[in-house]
From Swiss-Prot:
It comes from Burkholderia cenocepacia (strain HI2424). Keywords: ATP-binding, Magnesium, Manganese, Metal-binding, Nucleotide-binding, Nucleotidyltransferase, Transferase. The lineage of its organism: Bacteria, Pseudomonadati, Pseudomonadota, Betaproteobacteria, Burkholderiales. ATP binds at residues 109, 111-112, 132, 144-145, 195, 202, 281. Nucleotidyltransferase involved in the post-translational modification of proteins. It can catalyze the addition of adenosine monophosphate (AMP) or uridine monophosphate (UMP) to a protein, resulting in modifications known as AMPylation and UMPylation. This is Protein nucleotidyltransferase YdiU.
Amino acid sequence: MSFSRSAADAADTLPDLAATLGAPAERAFVTLGDAFHTRLPAAPLAAPYVVGFSDDVAQLLDLPPSIAAQPGFAELFAGNPTRDWPAHAMPYASVYSGHQFGVWAGQLGDGRALTIGELPGTDGRRYELQLKGGGRTPYSRMGDGRAVLRSSIREFLCSEAMHHLGIPTTRALTVIGSDQPVVREEIETAAVVTRVSESFVRFGHFEHFFSNDRPDLLRQLADHVIDRFYPACRDADDPYLALLEAATLRTADLVAQWQAVGFCHGVMNTDNMSILGVTIDYGPFGFVDAFDANHICNHSDTSGRYAYRMQPRIAHWNCYCLAQALLPLIGLQHGIADDDARAERAVDDAQAVLAKFPERFGPALERAMRAKLGLELEREGDAELANKLLETMHASHADFTLTFRRLAQISKHDASRDAPVRDLFIDREAFDAWANLYRARLSEETRDDAARAVAMNRANPKYVLRNHLAEVAIRRAKEKDFSEVERLAQILRRPFDEQPEHEAYAALPPDWAGSLEVSCSS
């Protein structure tokens, strides 16, 4: 269905939007059957109101930007449609399992997320819409099924910020707030964020059917993912091994991009890993400020399992979990009669695929770091040069984002221009030593300083969603002032542009930012 962009038509759209979202032919995941999900209505928020709205996502879904101002919009995306959910359009929560902090957690599932259907995108793809905070489900365990305003604003802002950084991610259409109280570490208010993605299938979905010894359902799920998202795998000698390889390589690429911008996910459990290799489940995430390779963004991660430097290793480990779940399917087409022989070959084939993770991740990160350093030519010592910079940053706790952004000001021939970036380092002699190595490397490049600076500023964002910026927006939103949410969203749409009128948003964090803590208690 295509939506016009007039305000009048936007108003006409809303009464039928729930039915449109839930049209059976448009909900491929639902057609897999009851073993994969539970249908139930959302538990609507009381007196909902719009906190944030993404024009970009609306445009992607061919929705008029004016739709957010229409009566009924907040109600629909708070889980309360303008009329009862049609039987065929009832939202659903999916079931999955997974490893949490490295320990098998058993059955999990969408404990507070309800998928309300699909819409066609203007890019030719189809997108699922999911209400995070839509109420209790059979998979809520001890939870209340709610999300709170602070975490919903953070996810809304970061989903869109990551997209504009060029990093694969789920998107966010809107945040709906309410004065409805929710008990966490303190009394907060409830909210719902509407997530948008081609699919919300996770590694944990495969683990669930593997752990329950349901190879038939495991194969059904894998076929769905292959046919809809990885059609090239169908033509491979072993489609399920090809699926594992595709997901593994996408995951390696994704984490390389995280590392390159200093992004920490915070909760890289297998149930928080997308089979499409996109960033999903924004919880206690954070962008590194003062660089520490051991930075832990999640206050609940007392062991540092998901620290910045650990993310590549954990992503690789998670791919092993996915491989284990897919083992019953790998090699089926080879016609090996002996089950033990087939299983042994499946393990060997899976291990060969998993060995490709570091082979993919290393070069991907090297390419990203070479771009961040403004190096066009590939030289053997480039990775060592980048690592030496990170070590020097780590020792001085130099700001990650500002360091890389200001490197563009370094001149091949004039060390006096180093001051803006040099001043970020406590040990300036150590920086000088690195800068001399860098200048020597730049002498091998053909671009002049100006051309290199332009290229570097396209690789090094000036603006990222620092925790203190999100915190200011959240505090104002709690007072019903949503202007800072909108302002931040607009700034983060153009992370690589100078935007001199917003210079304060690119500054070093204030002292009070060091006391901010984010955890899993959203």
